[in-house]
Amino acid sequence: MAANSTRRPIIAFMSDLGTTDDSVAQCKGLMYSICPDVTVVDVCHSMTPWDVEEGARYIVDLPRFFPEGTVFATTTYPATGTTTRSVAVRIKQAAKGGARGQWAGSGAGFERAEGSYIYIAPNNGLLTTVLEEHGYLEAYEVTSPKVIPEQPEPTFYSREMVAIPSAHLAAGFPLSEVGRPLEDHEIVRFNRPAVEQDGEALVGVVSAIDHPFGNVWTNIHRTDLEKAGIGYGARLRLTLDGVLPFEAPLTPTFADAGEIGNIAIYLNSRGYLSIARNAASLAYPYHLKEGMSARVEAR
């Protein structure tokens, strides 16, 4: 529940629906019809269709940047029309993140109260990272005819089972009345690659390519580096795909790498070890992809 009851409700909307037709507009039109005072923020509608893990990456950090009371409507629904239902959860807390571990807006009175945010998504693993990073207080299967159509369009569950109920929640419909409570084991999750220690090295994977820049992100977090005694200024060897070693100091900015094209090893804005070329692409000329191994060690 929002700390300020006079604040306009907010829905942050992420999907794989694209922007080449009226699908997103239909969803947003229904949101405004159900909750006329709502502000709908478009997070992203161009994620790779049906890629649950990519979608999970786009939504996990959002609470750091949104006011208390925001409803996050997040969807990629490959099983549309089946028995897969949506799940609505109240997260426990907005976890700290970023390269330095700070809150967005820290120092400006932006502390978040526990239980301030609701996510609604298909129960297909999309909330995996959210639940692991933030924890949750309550979770429900979204089945009530008060918040979803009695005969939902089977090919458009993103609209029927996510967008519409998110608007009811933003309008104040009680979370506990959207459907039956879910046990933890009933919430679908995917397996996240673990970061492991191999001698003095940390071993993870390439978690994302930062398009369109061609920067390479790994799943090795700032906290993993801290435990290994690695901080800014340490000279690192980062080996990708087992055969591509790059060496550079860990620096806060791309410009610290010096000339254009030089290698920069840095922490991205989400707090994960990353590698780039200053003002140039690294991923594209080296054909780097998600899922490749990433091994880092101090030199």
UniProtKB/Swiss-Prot annotation:
Q: Which GO terms describe its molecular function?
A: adenosyl-fluoride synthase activity
Stretches of the chain forming a coiled coil according to its record = none
Q: What is its EC number?
A: 2.5.1.63
Thermal characteristics = Optimum temperature is 55 degrees Celsius.
Indicate whether S-adenosyl-L-methionine appears among the record's keywords. yes
Q: What role does it play?
A: Involved in the biosynthesis of fluorometabolites. Catalyzes the formation of a C-F bond by combining S-adenosyl-L-methionine (SAM) and fluoride to generate 5'-fluoro-5'-deoxyadenosine (5'-FDA) and L-methionine. It can also use 2'-deoxyadenosine in place of adenosine as substrate.
**UniProt entry keywords in alphabetical sequence:** S-adenosyl-L-methionine, Transferase
Residues the entry annotates as binding S-adenosyl-L-methionine: D16, D21, D22, S23, Y77, S158, D210, N215, S269, R270, R277, N278, A279
What does the record give as the reaction this protein catalyses? fluoride + S-adenosyl-L-methionine = 5'-deoxy-5'-fluoroadenosine + L-methionine
Its EC top class is transferase
Q: Which organism is it from?
A: Streptantibioticus cattleyicolor (Streptomyces cattleya)
Name of the featured protein: Fluorinase
Question: Please, which domain of life does this record's source organism belong to?
Answer: Bacteria
Q: Which SUPFAM superfamilies match?
A: Bacterial fluorinating enzyme, C-terminal domain, Bacterial fluorinating enzyme, N-terminal domain
**Region forming the signal peptide:** none
Result when mutating D16A: Loss of 5'-FDA synthase activity
Consequence when changing T80A: Weak 5'-FDA synthase activity. 2-fold increase of the affinity binding for S-adenosyl-L-methionine and 4-fold decrease of the affinity binding for fluoride
Gene3D superfamilies found in the cross-reference section: Bacterial fluorinating enzyme like (2.40.30.90), S-adenosyl-l-methionine hydroxide adenosyltransferase, N-terminal (3.40.50.10790)
Tell me which family the UniProt entry assigns to this protein.
Belongs to the SAM hydrolase / SAM-dependent halogenase family.
Summarizing the annotation, the consequence of altering S158G is:
Weak 5'-FDA synthase activity
Activation/inhibition comment: Competitively inhibited by S-adenosyl-L-homocysteine (AdoHcy) and S-adenosyl-L-homocysteine (SAH). Sinefungin is only weakly inhibitory.
Give the multimer and partner information: Homohexamer; dimers of trimer.
Q: Which InterPro entries is this protein grouped with?
A: Fluorinase, SAM_HAT_C, SAM_HAT_N, SAM_OH_AdoTrfase, SAM_OH_AdoTrfase_C_sf, SAM_OH_AdoTrfase_N_sf
Please give one Pfam family short name.
SAM_HAT_N
Mutating F156A has which effect? Weak 5'-FDA synthase activity
